[in-house]
Swiss-Prot record:
Keywords linked to the UniProt accession: DNA-binding, Repressor, Transcription, Transcription regulation
Domain of life the protein comes from: Bacteria
Gene Ontology molecular function, alphabetical: DNA-binding transcription factor activity; transcription cis-regulatory region binding
Membrane spanning stretches: none
Signal peptide from the UniProt entry: none
InterPro entries given in the database record: Homeodomain-like_sf, HTH-type_TetR-like_transc_reg, HTH_TetR, Tet_transcr_reg_TetR-rel_C_sf, TetR_C
The name this protein goes by in its record: Uncharacterized HTH-type transcriptional regulator YdeS
Organism: Bacillus subtilis (strain 168)
SUPFAM superfamilies named in the record: Homeodomain-like, Tetracyclin repressor-like, C-terminal domain
HTH tetR-type domain span: 11-71
GO biological process, one term: regulation of DNA-templated transcription
DNA-binding region: 34-53
UniProt cross-references to Pfam families, sorted A to Z: TetR_C_11 (PF16859), TetR_N (PF00440)
């Protein structure tokens, strides 16, 4: 479902299509967006869109990812714990913004479209997970976290509740909640020296 490869493209037209798709998504929601509407907004033909994308979900996914990448840099504060707090906070802020709520629509649509679900898993969630994994691995290397830390479980403990609130309970996900979440998750996984220094 990713953009089709091997076809030269005009970057201005490509950007116009992605901008049109994203604007329509924010205005009308995933279900109401069509390739026809994207083409009309971008002032291009449907054939131009289909040269580069296989369907509307592929266009929307690319438009969403370009925004997410810009909004979610990998932090480097000098402290592994603070890096994770910042990373998780930035993610929560993005997901609760109007732009970020798009992922909830994509998740919903993905329940009936396995190809779309695979797209957002591999192109949005897995890269964020790899970022978190890298931050935790750095903490172990620096001696701030226990050497025997189960990284995969730690990621689930930190990030899972954010999505649980967003998708299931609807409870608020603010900066204070995310910080408390991370600090509680880190209890017991910090190296002794790091714990004593806090």
């Amino acid at each position: 479902m990713q953009s089709k490869r091997g076809r030269p493209r005009d970057e201005g037209t490509h950007k116009a299509i992605l901008s049109a798709a994203y604007d329509l998504l924010l205005e009308k929601g995933f279900d109401a967006v069509t390739v026809d509407k994207i083409a009309e907004r971008a002032k291009v033909s449907k054939a131009t869109i289909y040269k580069w994308w296989s369907n509307k979900a592929a266009v929307i996914m690319d438009s969403f990812l370009s925004t997410a990448t810009d909004r979610l840099p990998v932090p480097d504060t000098g402290s592994s714990v603070q890096d994770i707090v910042t990373h998780a906070t930035n993610l929560a802020r993005f997901l609760t913004s109007r732009e970020g709520t798009v992922i909830k629509e994509l998740i919903g649509a993905g329940q009936l479209d396995e190809k779309l679900a695979e797209e957002y898993r591999t192109r949005f969630f897995q890269p964020r997970r790899l970022q978190a994994k890298g931050l935790l691995e750095k903490g172990i290397q620096k001696g701030e976290l226990r050497e025997n830390l189960d990284i995969e479980v730690s990621i689930d403990l930190i990030y899972g509740p954010i999505f649980y609130r967003l998708l299931i309970t609807g409870d608020e996900v603010n900066d204070s909640y995310v910080r408390d979440l991370v600090m509680n998750a880190f209890k017991g996984v910090q190296a002794t020296s790091a714990t004593e220094s806090m």
